[in-house]
Design a protein with these regions (language model features):
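Thioredoxin-like thiol-disulfide oxidoreductase module
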Residues: 33-49
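Residue-level detector of anion-binding/catalytic polar loops
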Residues: 28, 50
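Local sequence-structure signature of Cys/Sec-based thiol-disulfide redox active-site neighborhoods
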Residues: 1-25
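A short, hydrophobic beta-strand/beta-hairpin element that forms part of a small beta-sheet core
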Residues: 53-63
Length: 73
């Protein structure tokens, strides 16, 4: 399985739901706070996303809480 990175920010309900779903599935993931890391924020913007969370797993990536895509990991 590819490394999973969740680009998150504080007080983000969809971020919380995404992390909870990954934990329930037993999937290890890294959380990067885009409010504290400007390079990470730029990476998310470069991917074309304006909404948190942005999730990156290998070549796949998406934004928002997407249980359908999380279940496919």
């Amino acid at each position: 399985m590819s490394k999973v990175t969740v680009y998150s920010k504080p007080n983000c309900p969809q971020c919380t739901q995404t992390k909870k779903k990954l934990e329930q599935k037993g999937i290890a993931f890294e959380v990067i706070d885009i409010s504290q890391d400007k390079n990470a924020l730029q990476h998310v913007l470069d991917l074309g996303y304006r909404q948190a969370p942005a999730v990156v797993s290998g070549e796949k990536h998406w934004s928002g809480f997407r249980p359908d895509l999380l279940s496919a990991l």
